[in-house]
From Swiss-Prot:
SUPFAM superfamilies: HisI-like (SSF141734). Binds 1 Mg(2+) ion per subunit. Binds 1 zinc ion per subunit. GO terms for biological process: L-histidine biosynthetic process. Zn(2+) binds at residues 79, 96, 103. This is Phosphoribosyl-AMP cyclohydrolase. Keywords: Amino-acid biosynthesis, Cytoplasm, Histidine biosynthesis, Hydrolase, Magnesium, Metal-binding, Zinc. Homodimer. Coiled coil: none annotated. It catalyses: 1-(5-phospho-beta-D-ribosyl)-5'-AMP + H2O = 1-(5-phospho-beta-D-ribosyl)-5-[(5-phospho-beta-D-ribosylamino)methylideneamino]imidazole-4-carboxamide.
Length: 131
């Protein structure tokens, strides 16, 4: 592990840090996930975003199943050291497992959440019928 990379990062009690993926060109927030030290190290080593799945309890590379990888252009750490922003190039234009550009596709509209972004590709086409 790279000591310089990790020493400023404040991982929580579970060994995780919040990671925000933001489109490097449009600046749109595409997704928020979690990283452990291994995922952060792999991200730096490979240049592609890696995360830690809390539900599956394992490290994974974004796009390993879908092909929608995230090429990291820049890493930034916030002033408290507890959140990482990755400026990325999103392969295929789809970051969300629902087949949308962003996981933030719901918009508050006068008392209800409404879907603001269209599905670009159906989940079954991306992952097959087993997902």
């Amino acid at each position: 592990m790279d000591k310089n990379l990790l020493e400023a990062v404040k991982f929580d009690e579970k060994g995780l840090v919040c990671a925000i993926a933001q489109d490097a060109e449009t600046k749109r927030v595409l997704m928020v996930a979690w990283m452990n030290a291994e995922a952060l190290q792999k991200t730096v080593e490979t240049g592609f975003a890696h995360y830690y799945s809390r539900s599956r309890q394992k490290q994974w590379m974004k796009g390993e199943e879908s092909g929608h990888t995230q090429k990291v252009r820049e890493l930034r750490l916030d002033c408290d050291g507890d959140t990482i922003v990755m400026l990325i190039a999103q392969n295929g234009g789809i970051a969300c497992h629902t087949g949308r550009e962003s996981c933030f596709y719901k918009k508050w509209n006068g008392g209800a959440w409404e879907t603001a972004d269209a599905v670009l590709k159906d989940e079954k086409e991306i992952y097959g019928s087993t997902h």
